[in-house]
């Protein structure tokens, strides 16, 4: 059901949601439109809720909610879900940002991630970044609050000036943190897939158990030759492409494979490693890159 059978375009949908949220929380809060450019220069359209004199402004993005609305959900029900989301943050104490100007206090929370340079030109306009081959390294601060959960804050040039450090120091400290907190995992792609599918198979609510069992059996039966694609990531499988920045990582991969190898950035979470066994020509490599990134 829609409002009297009428379908709103996105801008009017957003205004209606803002109206519902504003009416619910009253004058003590302000509701603002907030657009955010994230990885691969994708722009997300959201709204934020801020209590007066607070430095917390939680955001909820409306793009997917509009698709749900377009598929038949009522705007009132969507507004209620948005309000429920914001209720989590009401009366939550401010994040402790008092130490953000103290580099020694915050550097243990620094991290890095690797992004595609050409797809993130807008994202890095107000960020500190370092070029790395055809990629870019960007930096963030992790925070964790018992009520809000985990989050990250991108490092900006203003923060770098406030800390009075150079980019080399930032890169060194952030990489050391990642190496300590997110250790390297290097495994064959087949073995990684087997683990992933077994995890799904063990989910008793999964309705495709037999299909998954068949896939696992097929993967397990692959020969050593067919297992020559490897994955470089970290143990959490989150932002694992940054492991190539860890000290000695690539030399250790070379020692493990006992040969030269090719690197194919698959996503921000992993790197595909292909040993140079003499059979990988330009056409084969291009096909692999297209397959990995498809």
What are these regions (language model features)?
Residues 2-27, 242, 278-287, 294:
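Activation/maturation switch segments at domain boundaries
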Residues 3, 64, 156, 231-235, ...:
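Generic, low-specificity signal for short hydrophobic/alpha-helical stretches with a mild N-terminal bias
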Residues 4, 8, 157-161, 165, ...:
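Generic amphipathic alpha-helical segments used as scaffolds and interaction surfaces in large
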Residues 7-224:
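Extended, low-hydrophobicity segments enriched in charged/polar residues
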Residues 40, 223-225, 256-257, 266:
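A generic structural signal for short, non-catalytic loop/turn and secondary-structure boundary residues
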Residues 48-50, 231-233, 274:
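Residues in well-ordered beta-strands of folded domains
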Residues 211-241, 245-252:
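Long, contiguous, structured domain-core segments that constitute the functional module of a protein
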Residues 235-294:
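C-terminal structured domains
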């Amino acid at each position: 059901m829609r409002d009297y059978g009428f379908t709103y375009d996105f801008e009017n949908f957003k205004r209606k949601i803002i109206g519902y949220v504003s009416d619910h929380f009253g004058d003590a809060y302000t509701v603002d439109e907030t657009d955010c450019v994230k990885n691969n220069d994708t722009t997300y359209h959201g709204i934020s809720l801020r209590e007066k004199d607070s430095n917390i402004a939680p955001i909820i993005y409306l793009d997917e909610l509009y698709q749900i609305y377009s598929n038949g959900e009522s705007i009132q029900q969507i507004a209620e879900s948005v309000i429920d989301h914001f209720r989590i943050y009401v009366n939550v104490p401010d994040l402790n940002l008092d130490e953000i100007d103290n580099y020694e206090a915050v550097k243990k929370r620094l991290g890095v991630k690797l992004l595609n340079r050409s797809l993130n030109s807008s994202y890095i306009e107000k960020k500190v970044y370092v070029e790395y081959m055809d990629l870019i390294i960007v930096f963030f601060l992790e925070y964790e609050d018992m009520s809000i959960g985990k989050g990250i804050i991108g490092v900006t040039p203003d923060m770098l000036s406030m800390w009075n450090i150079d980019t080399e120091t930032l890169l060194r400290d952030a990489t050391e943190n990642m190496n300590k907190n997110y250790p390297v995992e290097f495994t064959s792609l087949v073995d990684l897939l087997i683990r992933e599918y077994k995890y799904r198979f063990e989910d008793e609510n999964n309705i495709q158990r037999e299909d998954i069992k068949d896939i696992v059996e097929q993967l397990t039966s692959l020969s050593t030759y067919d297992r020559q694609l490897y994955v470089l990531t970290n143990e959490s499988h989150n932002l694992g492409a940054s492991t190539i920045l860890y000290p000695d990582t690539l030399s250790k991969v070379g020692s493990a494979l006992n040969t030269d190898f090719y690197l194919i950035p698959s996503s921000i979470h992993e790197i595909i490693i292909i040993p140079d066994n003499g059979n990988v020509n330009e056409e084969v490599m291009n096909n692999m890159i297209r397959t990995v990134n498809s």
